Regions:
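Short, structured motif recognition centered on aromatic/hydrophobic residues
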Residues: 2-6, 18, 30, 50-54
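Short amphipathic alpha-helical segments
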Residues: 14-39
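Short amphipathic alpha-helices within nucleic acid-binding modules
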Residues: 16-18, 59-71
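Short, flexible helix/strand-to-coil boundary loops that buttress conserved ligand/catalytic motifs
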Residues: 22, 67, 80
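Intrinsic, low-complexity N-terminal interaction/targeting segments
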Residues: 29, 65-67, 105
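Glycine-rich beta-strand-turn "strand-cap" elements at beta-sheet edges
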Residues: 32-52, 58, 75-113
């Protein structure tokens, strides 16, 4: 299993607008296509203006297919038009689960459904 972590730095004072746009438009589109939302966060201490979210995938092939479908979704494209101007920078990490954590993550994801 893999977990992708995405970190977006948004313009100072724009975190609330970013999250509102995501909740109203982006989240519905993502949840239609991406299999497992692990978490969605914003920073309060340390480096500020960060939005962090994590998504789990069974394998890289699943990730590629899901992201391609999401990218083609008109609702996702409409969301990007609203939120891209708020983003200063973006990072992405693709992490492979440690062997002993795979089953635990699967149970956590199943419990959250």
């Amino acid at each position: 299993m893999y977990v992708e972590e995405r970190v977006y730095t948004v313009l100072p004072g724009k975190g609330g607008e970013y999250l509102k746009n995501y909740e109203e438009i982006g989240m519905k589109a993502q949840l239609r296509h991406l299999p497992h939302m692990v978490g969605y966060y914003f920073t309060e201490v340390g480096q500020l203006n960060l939005i962090v979210h994590q998504w789990a995938y069974d394998d890289l092939n699943q990730r590629d297919k899901c992201r391609a479908a999401m990218t083609a979704d008109p609702d996702w494209q409409a969301y990007l038009v609203k939120n891209r101007p708020l983003i200063v920078s973006q990072e992405s990490r693709l992490m492979k689960c440690a062997p002993f954590f795979v089953e635990r993550l699967k149970k956590m994801l199943a419990a959250g459904k």
